[in-house]
Design a protein with these regions (language model features):
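Short, Lys/Arg-rich, polar N-terminal cytosolic tail immediately upstream
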Residues: 1-5
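Juxtamembrane extracytoplasmic/periplasmic/luminal helical "stalk" adjacent to the first N-terminal
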Residues: 9-13, 17-123, 202
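Extracytoplasmic/secreted envelope proteins and their assembly/folding machinery
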Residues: 59, 77, 109-113, 190-193, ...
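Amphipathic alpha-helical bundle/coiled-coil segments
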Residues: 70, 185-190, 239, 267, ...
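Solvent-exposed, extracytoplasmic
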Residues: 107-115, 209-211, 235, 239-281
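Extracellular/periplasmic ligand-sensing ectodomains of membrane signal-transduction proteins
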Residues: 117-201, 207-214, 272-291
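PAS/PAS-like sensory domains
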Residues: 199-205, 259, 302-308
């Protein structure tokens, strides 16, 4: 039977049925589309949550490492600050009691040795007075190394302990105090001496290599100005062996992503104080080791005290800034994960 032979009522019913069928099909299609779209949104949201969760875990690791390193620096800072006050007190008492210059220098030599011996975590301790600022008798003590006096008679004593309990001493020569040649960081080689003189504030020196007992040691120094009535009379330097930071970076690398993460400890000038991937890169600039991202990471580190991240080439790099001593520019712990 053709459609022309159908009654008007049947035609209306058929048309209504077709319309209803079309509406049902449309609703089903829209429902399927929405389900698919919702699934995509859920998957995207889940992926984002997983990424954010992973990033948060990495940031937490970086903050934990930064805190541990900060404590090491602060321990050295507080110890050096306390000993600086002790030296000032000793000098003040010597003036009041008219202590003989020989006895004063001998006593200071013993005091510096004892202070270092009492703290096996420190690599070295130096005390350098301004010319004639100790007893105004430098000329009587030139080349008397056993009394901490250098080639000009200046009290310029350095005690070191390459291994805990093994101590050696030397009088730092005038040539070392005047060495303004620069290293990879751009700082002068005598910045451990010149920085507190110029700023009259405690300084932390960029990582540098120094030979101690014939061994090349990567170290940094926290240096304190000794002031009397606002005038600088001496500089005290506390030396820290950075081998501990290299060991820390390697240990952290093993614990992150089954050893696939690279961990670096970076100074304010971008010098590598720890680099789990390659020990031979220590004391080099991060922007030379990581040509693509190094400069940007150094800038991110300098922005403040919050972790900063950088994505690229299927790697996530998170740098966590920290201040090694009060008032210093930030250093950073850099985690590089796949």
């Amino acid at each position: 039977m053709s459609i022309r032979q159908l009654s008007i009522q049947w035609k209306i019913s058929l048309l209504s049925g077709l319309c209803l069928l079309s509406i049902v099909a449309l609703l089903v299609g829209l429902s399927l589309y929405r389900m698919d779209h919702t699934t995509q949104l859920v998957e995207a949201s889940s992926t984002q949550m997983l990424n954010e969760s992973g990033k948060a875990r990495i940031e937490a690791q970086g903050e934990a490492q930064a805190l541990a390193i900060s404590r090491q620096f602060m321990d050295a800072y507080q110890y050096g600050n306390g000993f600086a006050r002790q030296v000032l007190f000793l000098r003040e008492q010597s003036e009041k009691r008219f202590l003989d210059a020989f006895d004063l220098r001998e006593d200071l030599t013993r005091q510096v040795k004892a202070a270092l011996q009492a703290n096996p975590d420190l690599l070295g301790l130096s005390l350098v007075f301004e010319a004639n600022a100790l007893d105004n008798k430098d000329a009587l003590f030139d080349h008397q190394k056993e009394l901490g006096s250098n080639d000009k008679g200046r009290f310029s004593l350095y005690w070191s302990q390459p291994t805990p309990g093994t101590l050696t001493s030397m009088a730092l020569p005038e040539a070392d105090l005047a060495d303004t040649s620069t290293g990879p960081s751009g700082q002068a080689n005598n910045s451990w001496f010149s920085c507190p003189r110029e700023t009259l504030k405690p300084c932390i020196i960029e990582p540098y290599f120094y030979k101690i007992d014939g061994q090349k040691v990567l170290m940094t120094s926290i240096v304190f100005p000794l002031l009397v009535n606002g005038k600088l009379i001496a500089s005290l330097s506390v030396d820290i062996n950075l081998n501990s930071l290299q060991a820390l970076s390697k240990l952290a690398s093993k614990e992150l992503y089954e050893g696939q993460a690279d961990v670096s400890i970076v100074s304010s000038a971008g010098i590598l104080a720890g680099f789990s991937k390659d020990v031979s890169k220590l004391a080099q600039r991060l922007d030379q080791v990581d040509v693509k991202n190094g400069a940007q990471l150094i800038k991110l580190m300098a922005t403040g005290d919050q972790p900063q991240s950088l994505h690229g080439h299927e790697r996530l790099k998170i740098v966590t800034p920290f201040k090694p001593i009060p008032g210093s520019k930030p250093w950073g712990v850099l985690l590089d994960v796949p």
